[in-house]
């Protein structure tokens, strides 16, 4: 690396450290640069999961991810293919190898967040400074613009809450460099490299980046920067061929990850989207972008528009400022879904480019131009103060006004003194950016966004990962060394609790999940999760049949919540605050069946009928042979009294009038004396436009989203299991609800007990799960189906006695397959969907890229 590049990177690193000054101070005091929401629930959790996997040579599948899943494809939106995460992981692994660091748990990843961010931001500043210098040939202006881009508030917002969002800020400048190399020099190498990197790292932000680069190229065709640029048809050919090669190179990562995204289940966004909304104050208080004063001043200096680079980036910035105020544009950048302002880093980049171009023209700055520009900008700030009724004496607002005045003063000095004042302008802009960044960290993120609550004390408390609960789980795992057993426990609403603690559980929280599992929860078995969400599944609704079917051996709970313990679970271990219950009706991990049920025949039957069918046999979508008659549990609602308390119920409408809520009470007239549970199901929808609510059914509590929430499932059919009692109370807060299709079923668990008796003599032999491969032997006395409590997903391959066999989706969401009489040596292997063919495409495309680049410009990129 040339000395000048070393100097630029050293300066980038120094600025990055200064930009993190507040968070470094917080780290020293035991507070971390990680959001209290998704930061603790996903970011540090997935890094722990993937680091543990990768360092053990397991790159594709994890049985502990929810009910089991392909982590390469389902976590591709996060870190699984991130070059920056892989680089950090390699460094951490080396530090572990020389014993400089210890356990890489969630606490470690929270503690290291600020240092990873410093490294990443230094790369962002370095790459963008290099690209701006290529465009401007002015190193100081380019570096100052790069600082504006790197330390923009959207970087710190995204890095703190959703760390992987900021990876794309490294690749965006490289894409621009690649486009410029094609337009100016007919050299495709940089574009192929940058496009491949962005496609591999994150398909979502690749989508945003490629939209931007398309817009950038269109602007470049309108604004020529060099007199001898390639003809457009040549550019188009180079872009198309280079883009095609880039997609090929990225295929091994891009294809499986995009398949994972397409295999997700999200209800369509049905709310009206506005074209324009100007509510956000981008000069003072926006949580996404604060427009730098220097950029605004430069916009109104007419002579700067003679510089084509300034004209280019100013035009792009004005367009993206308009996009910022357009929810419809935010929807387009979010894949035509709910509006999300995740694309604003592009605006930060174009503003930085315009500022850098303006700074390169300081020697041309005239006083007579600066005066009206300053007047217009001051009026803009005064307008925003008036419109948003701001208190200018608040520290944050006062600081922005002070920085504005300092910037104006520095520019006037530059207009008078020219060369002598230039460095003062650069210095004030950089210092202003650092000041705004650190102020934003303190007031918006730490105090306003609760990052100050993310402490070492919290991360080692019982609210997150405490000693008492950890030791209880370790005791249980030491006592029962079955590596496949599942424990149902969630610490509060943290669905990724099993990953945090290191056990196999029943819950997961991720933006991308197996759609068959989500459908299993939402629709097929109507399993209430205690919290409505499109990106989570949790527990099994305390339903004993499902625990036995899915190898749920233990149920852990706080002692204050023991009323929810499923039927057939007996207390096994306890501490002062927690108790673990053991399932007395366990079914084997490998289950066999010859009774076949049809999904379509069970479609309109209650969840209890489906559970009983799964216990008696196997449910298939398209069974080829004879099917069994479906179970038909009796609906007891016609033999029950229904009364309302602190509410009125008429024609399927429940109006709750009580200030503390009201209830609909179901009382069976002739209750059975046999032990067991009730399953109560109903359709429930709030009539309130924008208000979530809590539903209680006896002691069971669950929450439902607002009708306007983008995270609402749109599923309003609810089934709740309650222990047998004299009555069932459906309790709701004050309001009006559509409540209909009420049904009540009794479960005495005789079907479960029969299934346990029938499966006691059958047992898989030599069962071994190693990374992405499961092997076992099974002797059958006749041809039967074998079912496994492993989620069905594309990528599984099956061999029986060395021959490839077909895997079927059984019991709505799990693996099933036919096996023959006699000995069956079974091998199941998982690779990400289309991984093998995609890997071949990547290799061929890489070779093609080398040939193509050398052919275009030998020895040059």
Swiss-Prot record:
Transmembrane segments: 4-24, 75-95, 106-126, 159-179, 199-219, 238-258, 282-302, 313-333, 343-363, 370-385, 396-416, 425-445, 833-853
Main subcellular location: membrane
Cellular location(s): Cell membrane
Coiled-coil zones: 738-766
UniProt cross-references to InterPro entries, sorted A to Z: Uncharacterised_YfhO
Top-level taxonomic group: Bacteria
Pfam families given in the database record: YfhO
Cellular compartments per GO CC: plasma membrane
Keyword annotations of the record: Cell membrane, Coiled coil, Membrane, Transmembrane, Transmembrane helix
PANTHER family: INTEGRAL MEMBRANE PROTEIN, INTEGRAL MEMBRANE PROTEIN-RELATED
Protein's recorded name: Uncharacterized protein YfhO
Organism: Bacillus subtilis (strain 168)
Protein's gene: yfhO
């Amino acid at each position: 690396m040339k000395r000048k590049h070393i100097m630029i990177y050293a300066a980038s690193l120094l600025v990055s450290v200064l930009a993190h000054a507040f968070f470094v101070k917080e780290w020293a005091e035991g507070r971390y640069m990680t959001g209290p929401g998704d930061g603790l629930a996903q970011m540090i959790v997935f890094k722990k999961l993937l680091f543990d996997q990768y360092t053990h040579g397991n790159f594709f599948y994890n049985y502990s991810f929810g009910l089991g899943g392909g982590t390469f494809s389902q976590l591709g939106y996060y870190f699984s293919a991130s070059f920056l995460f892989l680089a950090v992981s390699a460094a951490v692994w080396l530090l572990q190898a020389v014993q400089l660091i210890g356990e890489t748990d969630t606490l470690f990843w929270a503690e290291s967040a600020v240092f990873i961010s410093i490294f990443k931001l230094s790369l962002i500043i370095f790459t963008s400074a290099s690209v701006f210098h290529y465009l401007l040939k002015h190193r100081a202006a380019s570096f100052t613009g790069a600082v504006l881009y790197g330390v923009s508030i959207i970087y710190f917002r995204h890095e703190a809450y959703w760390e992987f969002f900021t990876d794309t800020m490294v690749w965006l400048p490289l894409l621009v460099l690649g486009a410029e190399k094609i337009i100016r020099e007919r050299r495709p190498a940089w574009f192929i490299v940058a496009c491949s990197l962005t496609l591999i790292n994150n398909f979502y932000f690749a989508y945003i980046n490629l939209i931007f680069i398309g817009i950038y190229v269109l602007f470049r065709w309108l604004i020529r920067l060099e007199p001898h640029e390639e003809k457009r048809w040549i550019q188009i050919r180079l872009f198309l061929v280079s883009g095609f090669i880039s997609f090929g190179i990225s295929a091994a990562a891009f294809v499986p990850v995009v398949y994972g995204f397409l295999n997700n289940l999200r209800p369509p966004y049905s709310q009206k989207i506005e074209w324009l909304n100007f509510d956000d104050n981008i000069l003072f208080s926006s949580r996404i972008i604060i427009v730098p004063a220097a950029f605004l001043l430069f916009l109104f200096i007419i002579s700067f528009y003679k510089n084509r680079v300034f004209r280019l980036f100013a035009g792009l910035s004005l367009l993206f400022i308009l996009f910022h105020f357009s929810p419809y544009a935010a929807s387009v950048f979010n894949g035509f879904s709910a509006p999300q302002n995740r694309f604003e880093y592009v605006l930060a980049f174009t503003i930085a480019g315009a500022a850098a171009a303006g700074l390169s023209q300081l020697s041309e700055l005239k006083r007579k131009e600066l005066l009206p520009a300053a007047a217009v900008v001051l009026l803009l700030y005064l307008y925003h103060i008036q419109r948003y009724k701001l208190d200018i004496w608040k520290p944050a607002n006062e600081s922005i006004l002070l920085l504005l005045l300092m910037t104006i003063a520095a520019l006037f000095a530059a207009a008078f003194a020219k060369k002598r004042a230039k460095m003062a302008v650069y210095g004030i802009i950089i210092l202003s950016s650092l000041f705004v960044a650190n102020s934003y960290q303190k007031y918006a993120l730490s105090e306003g966004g609760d990052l100050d609550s993310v402490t070492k004390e919290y991360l080692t408390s019982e609210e997150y990962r405490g000693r008492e609960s950890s030791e209880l789980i370790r005791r249980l795992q030491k006592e029962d060394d079955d590596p496949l057993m599942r424990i149902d426990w969630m610490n509060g609403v943290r669905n990724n609790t099993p990953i945090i603690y290191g056990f196999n559980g029943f819950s997961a929280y991720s933006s991308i999940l197996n759609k068959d599992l989500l459908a299993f929860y939402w629709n097929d078995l109507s399993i209430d999760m205690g919290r409505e969400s499109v990106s989570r599944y949790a527990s099994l609704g305390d339903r004993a049949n499902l625990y036995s079917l899915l190898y749920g051996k233990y149920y852990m709970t706080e002692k204050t919540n023991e009323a929810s313990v499923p039927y057939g679970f007996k207390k096994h271990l306890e501490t002062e605050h927690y108790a673990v219950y053991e399932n007395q009706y366990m079914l084997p991990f490998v289950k066999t069946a010859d009774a076949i049920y049809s999904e379509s025949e069970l479609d309109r039957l209650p969840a209890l009928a489906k559970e009983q069918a799964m216990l008696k046999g196997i449910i298939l979508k398209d069974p080829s042979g004879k099917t069994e008659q479906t179970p038909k549990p009796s609906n007891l609602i016609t033999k029950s009294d229904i009364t309302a308390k602190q509410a009125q119920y008429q024609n399927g409408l429940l109006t709750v009038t009580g200030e503390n809520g009201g209830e609909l009470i179901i009382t069976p007239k002739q209750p059975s004396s046999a032990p067991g549970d009730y399953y109560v199901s109903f359709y429930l929808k709030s009539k309130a436009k924008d208000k979530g609510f809590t539903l209680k059914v006896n002691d069971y509590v669950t929450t439902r989203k607002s009708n306007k929430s983008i995270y609402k499932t749109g599923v309003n059919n609810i089934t709740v299991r309650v222990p047998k009692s004299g009555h069932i109370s459906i309790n709701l807060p004050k309001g009006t609800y559509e409540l209909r299709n009420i049904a009540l079923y009794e479960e005495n668990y005789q079907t479960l007990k029969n299934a346990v008796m029938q499966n006691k003599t059958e047992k898989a032999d030599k069962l071994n799960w190693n990374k992405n491969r499961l092997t076992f032997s099974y002797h059958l006395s006749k041809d039967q189906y074998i079912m496994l409590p492993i989620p069905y997903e594309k990528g599984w391959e099956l061999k029986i006695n060395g021959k490839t066999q077909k895997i079927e989706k059984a019991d709505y969401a799990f693996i099933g397959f036919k096996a023959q009489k006699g000995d069956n040596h079974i091998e199941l292997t998982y690779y990400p969907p289309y991984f093998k063919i995609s890997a071949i495409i990547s290799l061929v495309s890489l070779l093609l890229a080398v040939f193509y680049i050398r052919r275009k410009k030998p020895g040059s990129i």
